[in-house]
């Protein structure tokens, strides 16, 4: 690992000085290599999936592991989109002339070497390579053993792109070992690694956060909420709740808790409950919601009383917690008590309610009349994301190019001395 770190540090200095054209050329070449290697990528992924199923891994993990032809094209398109984004490196802002005569400003610069530790998402290999490269950072990637073949195949495409642009292939290194000791080494090399981005289960992220000797950009889980306000538009409620909960169960921006204002709960919960039941979603409801759902004819295994733990839970499964609240005040209080700080949405046509929700809900992404599934770097126009942060220092929410840079102070003088 010392050799890997040393090579990454050397490559980071080359990348920090690399031109935008060189970085973009590498990204475009990576995208073409991925398209040219589609069959090989899908074959590698199929082998990973077969092994994962044979090992009895859960469906949420298998969902994250799966690559399709559409997914391969999405990776290539993501690389090209990052190439098309403005290069943040070298950007100078906030230049002001001081009374002394000097001009003081800020310049955006790369972080240096970024270590990314992730589990079952092979697309992270391409996304991380793209964002680190464009932002002038070297990357050390350590994927999960369940995606080893997929990650190796994608890494080959990344190296092809770097070589085509004349950039060091050590700028993006994918660790091919499945030894857990590699993670311990990666997160304790501050002389070579400037920041760690873990993407995976809560246990992995908690371990890295407690053991790392370098800064960590992270979120522990995604207990996302949708609140149906008493001024919600009926035409928007069902489609948004359906999308937010049922589009994909294994993602951190999937809604796990539904709050409904008491004044409109009888109106909306029957239709919402029937929709969720038709999609085999288990509902864990407060007593008031439980009664309304039973009145709508929902019984059996799909409906049960919620416990205190349910309000904290990131299910990553076809399960949702449902609570009737008095109104906006109780909804905000509930979210700020139980949320993981990831993403929350209010469905309302009331401007004041919407603005209060945006101001007072303490999460990385807060939405009005939109699905929580939009909390994603690609959807936010970042091209791709290195991860999502629920911390408040440095980067918050989806972390794209700008989140992988820092700023340094720059001073322009003309012979001034301090008096």
From Swiss-Prot:
GO terms for cellular component: cytoplasm. It is found in: Cytoplasm. Pfam families: Aldedh. Gene3D superfamilies: Aldehyde Dehydrogenase, Chain A, domain 1 (3.40.605.10), Aldehyde Dehydrogenase, Chain A, domain 2 (3.40.309.10). Its main location: cytoplasm. Keywords: Amino-acid biosynthesis, Cytoplasm, NADP, Oxidoreductase, Proline biosynthesis. Pathway: Amino-acid biosynthesis; L-proline biosynthesis; L-glutamate 5-semialdehyde from L-glutamate: step 2/2. HAMAP family: ProA. This is Gamma-glutamyl phosphate reductase. It comes from Azoarcus sp. (strain BH72).
